Amino acid sequence: MCIRDSVGTGENGRIKRQDIENLITSENINSKTSSTPDTPKKNETSKPKDKDKSISRLRKRIAENMVLSKQTSAHVMTSVEVDYENVEIFRSKLKTKFKEENGFSLTYLPFISLATIYALSEFPTVNSSFDLENGTHDIHSHINLGVAVDLNQEGLLVGTIPEADSLNLKGLARKISETSKKLREGKFGLEEVTGSTFTISNNGSFNSFMTAPIINQPNVAILSTESVKKRPVVIQSQDGTDSIAIRHTGILSLTWDHRVFDGSIALLFLNYIKDKLENSDWLQGLE
């Protein structure tokens, strides 16, 4: 600050007290302004850009089928909880030997599939196709089981196991393994991905709790398997007393077409599967 540079406002240019105070104030403002660094401009080129990705033919087909199904069927979801302890005890005893002898794992899916086939035989309306425009409702004589297969997160295909009702537990396990392998490797024919009469989506393999799957047209229902976990449950002993036990449990979710049947059939169907899983003697299925 230089007082000599100040212009006095008093008589004959004399510097007054107010002139000095004004000069001090002016210097402080200039000092603050000069000491404040310029804010650097944001580098616009460093921002990540959106990626334009073309839709694959498979994804486009999946999208079309999903929208068509939601526009066609009256989707309703019903679920039950299953105690898998009966399955787990049997599976844990045999899974190591089974894989050594057959070259693939004995998972929960073949057990669920076989129980589902039993239920479809008992409730044939669930194993059908429905065409409202033409006024037809076809009850299928055979069970062609569709199994949804994830293609390593690149899409989804439904592999078909024709006449699955003619197979036992071991035969189903083998067919499911072979079909899944073919689809993932892209080594399949058209007949292996068409013609299903009922579909199972194995979401449990991805650690799901509950899923509402979309019906695979022209089926009238689809079953979603959910993850099997150890959970505390209340069990009743033979003398009628209750106790807490750790059991392998999981949810089964059925999405069904309310145009074709009602909730009573959906629940009877699901509880039939539940009963088979909880009480069947699985040993005969491997013979």
What do these predicted ranges mean?
Residues 1-5:
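Conserved small/polar residues in nucleotide/adenosyl-binding loops
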Residues 11-19, 23, 27-287:
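C-terminal catalytic/motor cores of large multi-domain enzyme assemblies
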